[in-house]
Amino acid sequence: MAAGPAPPPGSPRAQMPHLRKMERVVVSMQDPDQGVKMRSQRLLVTVIPHAVTGSDVVQWLAQKFCVSEEEALHLGAVLVQHGYIYPLRDPRSLMLRPDETPYRFQVRLGGAAIYLAKKNIRKRGTLVDYEKDCYDRLHKKINHVWDLVLMQAREQLRAAKQRRKGDRLVIECQEQTYWLVNRPPPGAPSVLEQGPGRGSCAASRVLMTKSADFYKREIEYCRRALGRTRVKSSVCLEAYLSFCSQHRPHDPLVSGCLPSNPWISDNDTYWVMNAPTVAAPTKLRVERWGFSFRELLEDPVGRAHFTDFLGKEFSGENLSFWEACEELRYGAQAQVPTLVEAVYEQFLAPGAARWVNIDSRTMEQTLEGLRQPHRYVLDDAQLHIYMLMKKDSYPRFLKSDTYKGLLAEAGIPLETKRRVFPFMWRPRHSSPSPALLPTPVELTAACGPGGGDGVA
Amino acid sequence: MATEGLHENETLASLKSEAESLKGKLEEERAKLRDVELHQVAERVEALGQFVMKTRRTLKGHGNKVLCMDWCKDKRRIVSSSQDGKVIVWDSFTTNKEHAVTMPCTWVMACAYAPSGCAIACGGLDNKCSVYPLTFDKNENMAAKKKSVAMHTNYLSACSFTNSDMQILTASGDGTCALWDVESGQLLQSFHGHGADVLCLDLAPSETGNTFVSGGCDKKAMVWDMRSGQCVQAFETHESDINSVRYYPSGDAFASGSDDATCRLYDLRADREVAIYSKESIIFGASSVDFSLSGRLLFAGYNDYTINVWDVLKGSRVSILFGHENRVSTLRVSPDGTAFCSGSWDHTLRVWA
């Protein structure tokens, strides 16, 4: 049985939306005019009315939803697995065969108790172990109506003896399917299995009763939201178009990658050529540094070149300061006071060795905040320096000889020819786990002496 | 006494109507700037070619349903967790298992790889998030160095490291998200506002790195300010639980996958839903979504065992991938976008390219 608390029976959580949707599909499949063609199917010597063939089901689904036959077959198989359609031949396996195999639509769902009771009566108490468990549990659960269940079971058995062979066969298949779907044998997967129960937490129960607090929070949120500026849809949507087209050549799943996609060719050269720190970055990689300041900083090679460039312009302290602030923001809680102190000494104190040029108002506010250091205390100063680099140093870097040179030097890898003999086994190179390597030299080690200035 | 009760009821009713009218105004404001739809703008975009994606690796080794997976920054290693408590680290390129640890609980619904590649985090029905340093020392038992970081009052549904190994963001069935200091286990910030279980979260790829989005059983997707703990934006258009949220690579939007069988795109600057990815033939819930590197493709894993590939701009379904033999429970694109990995209740993980 599924682990975790099960949803209470009949609760809204138990009504999964996909079941309702499947029911709707099955109902439209049975429409006399638009539905699947019903006919009488011959099963050995018996004739079963109102049956459909597997291939008709697949065709109907493919047409109705404008999908391929493969997809229609998959969808049909799902309907069979959930018991909405049941096979008249070989009811032990709930599969949809796209051929003349006959199927019928499940008319009623429910009555596990009745089914078991009938089996119990027929076989005179020789239910299989797991069936017996279910029987006992059901008995306990619906004890008060058990007499009714037994009565119905006896009535159905009596009626069954009088029914025609065809009807008996149909009912048997129906019930066998129901049993397979709702109580699969141990070890077999169940389509009805759900993950751990959701919505059972206290939060949902408490907030279901919409209290005054709940509405007050909503009102506050709405007021804030109304005050926010929004951007016109056309502007926002155009931004996607330009982002997608700019990044398209860099998207391996859309445009492929050179020399080859390692997963497809089993050759990891692409990764070797694009390693985090590499002497000769590829052309695509160098191009990306020009997309945005963030892309430049996120690439260790790009950042290193930018650091050198800043050094030449004697503004290396800006990047170092920014890196130190990042270290503070994402560092361990216990380190916060030490890091704040170190940053102050190095970058903000009057006469500091690597004093950063922030506007007086931000500086004042920052120094004020330093009295009670916390991890976000340098945010304003950090943002100021970031914007300075982004608006000033970064554009100059892109126009610089350094960058232009890198772009010109950078190469485009040649495509690896596909292997001529695909059955030749090519060993897949393993790579050392990052966990094995010594602690990587952090680029944020700005608090060290002379970090990243490019000064010899 | 009787008059006091009456007074309370009136206040509640007036609060409710005030909230409702403000919500209406908000909708009006949003609608004013709605001058064009995405599929209209996308008409002049070139259509994508034929898509052939196949399973390139199958990772077998879990003895039970795979519930979650995450990529390492080295672009080839992954960590995966399953219903029976097993957490495995693989080099998925060679398909070798490198580490395995058994959690003391079942249904490990969340796992994450640390940015350094030296640790993993995981949790589930134990209501906690634990961090395991990865060690290759044969004498050391991985479970010995385990650090218990987060403590919730209900199951852990998602976890993610921030920019470093030292902070973890968690989402829980107790309706909250929380930010933790790994070393001390201290709660740095908590995020309240969801009306039911929170099922997923994703950190924003922004320059200033301050926000994240979460989705829950209350059908809401909420964007949070990590510093203040406040909800800055909320979207409520799905018709059922939101199982997965993922930012568009520019950080200006995010996609969601829900039990209502649709995926949706929400723009943060326009402050509204801008696209719905759905098809009549798709009946089962989407359990996990992720974008390709350029944001042009959206991969979504569904509870009917399939993976659908959507053209984000045009809104059409580009491809359907068969292969898994049970629900697809988790899906992530690799850090360099060369492949994506899917995990399933059929006990396997597949890498597709």
Curated annotation (Swiss-Prot), chain B:
WD repeats lie at residues 61-100, 103-142, 151-192, 194-236, 237-276, 278-320, 323-352. PROSITE patterns: WD_REPEATS_1, WD_REPEATS_2, WD_REPEATS_REGION. Its main location: membrane. It is found in: Membrane. GO terms for biological process: G protein-coupled dopamine receptor signaling pathway; negative regulation of voltage-gated calcium channel activity. Belongs to the WD repeat G protein beta family. This is Guanine nucleotide-binding protein subunit beta-5.
